[in-house]
């Protein structure tokens, strides 16, 4: 067990097998190499991706397919190799939220999903270069906003 201080839940004991390694960090947070996935609030679709090193670094994330069933992510071969993915059922995809006031104006980044190999506890943020998905998609808007034409 590892004791970590969290932004939203105070001090927690976390099993070592729940720690997720981000070997390259997350863009703009390259020194942050270890996170834990926690429910933000029971009964909601929101999670926290909490740094185990920096208390105040906690991203609010969601499963984008819960809000946008037509959303698609094709993993590049390099990501499959980097995360040691051998079974597609081991892959979990999350998207970062930008929480706004009022909450109904919150946006989700569909252009750079968080990809986690749940079996190996390895993750990365994948920037989709050839996508029309927006990085500021309104979370509660049912239609996807296409930022640009896909290449």
Swiss-Prot record:
It is found in: Cytoplasm. It comes from the Bacteria. It holds the Pfam family FliW. Keywords: Bacterial flagellum biogenesis, Chaperone, Cytoplasm, Translation regulation. One of its GO terms (biological process) is regulation of translation. The keyword Iron-sulfur does not apply. The keyword Chaperone applies. GO terms for cellular component: cytoplasm. Belongs to the FliW family. NCBIfam families: PRK13285.1-1. HAMAP family: FliW. Interacts with translational regulator CsrA and flagellin(s). Acts as an anti-CsrA protein, binds CsrA and prevents it from repressing translation of its target genes, one of which is flagellin. Binds to flagellin and participates in the assembly of the flagellum. This is Flagellar assembly factor FliW. It comes from Halalkalibacterium halodurans (strain ATCC BAA-125 / DSM 18197 / FERM 7344 / JCM 9153 / C-125) (Bacillus halodurans). The gene is fliW.
């Amino acid at each position: 067990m590892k004791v970590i201080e969290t932004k939203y839940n105070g001090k927690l004991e976390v099993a070592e097998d729940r720690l997720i390694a981000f070997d390259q960090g997350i863009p703009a947070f390259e020194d942050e190499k270890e996170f834990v996935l926690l429910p933000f609030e029971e009964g909601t679709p929101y999670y926290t991706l909490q740094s185990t090193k920096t208390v105040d670094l906690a991203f609010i994330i969601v499963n984008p397919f819960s809000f946008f069933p037509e959303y698609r992510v094709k993993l590049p071969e390099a990501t499959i190799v980097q995360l040691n993915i051998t079974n597609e059922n081991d892959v979990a995809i999350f998207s970062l939220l930008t929480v706004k006031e009022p909450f109904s104006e919150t946006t989700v980044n569909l252009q750079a999903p968080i990809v986690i190999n749940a079996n190996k506890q390895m993750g990365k943020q994948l920037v989709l270069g050839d996508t029309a998905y927006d990085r500021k998609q309104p979370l509660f808007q049912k239609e996807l906003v296409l930022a640009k034409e896909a290449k």
